[in-house]
Amino acid sequence: MKILHTADWHLGQTFYEYDRREEHLHFLEWLKQQIRQHEIDVLLIAGDVFDSPNPSAESQRMYYRFLREVTSENPSLQIIIIAGNHDSAARLEAPNPLLEDMNVTVRGVVRRNAEGDIDLQHLIVPLYTEGEVTAYCLAVPYPVSYTHLTLPTNR
């Protein structure tokens, strides 16, 4: 199984008033080429997809166009995306019903079960080779304050 790990795309970023859009477009084209050339099975995007929790429409189009194109060109590619500190976890997860049809799994929000414990099953993503589970990815998004584990105060 070949896993390609990326992070910190920061789509939509300007750097000292320099718009990095062209740079991002070139990166995404290069990434598609690498996935094709090296026959990648899993693409892991570990946070900071966007530079802002409220990305521009153009940045979102760039992101979704990339996901559509790369999954169309590589039907067996599995993509796992986790939210970083620059991303809006809820915004990243919002299109999950559509993305799941493209074999894209997004984990942005740490969920809790009925007992109030972190739902670890939600964070464990099976990785497949030829339809068989061959590994697991623990897809833990950036821990925001309300998801931190708390220790008992009476010790």
Map each language-model feature to its residues.
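Divalent metal-dependent hydrolysis catalytic cores, especially in the metallo-beta-lactamase
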Residues: 80-83, 139-143
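Extended, Lys/Arg-enriched charged tracts that mediate electrostatic binding to polyanionic substrates
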Residues: 106-108, 112-114
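Metal-dependent catalytic neighborhoods of phosphoester/phosphodiester hydrolases
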Residues: 49-66, 83-102, 108
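N-terminal active-site segment of His-dependent metallophosphoesterases
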Residues: 1-68, 75-76
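Short amphipathic alpha-helices and their capping/turn segments at secondary-structure boundaries
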Residues: 27-37, 119-134
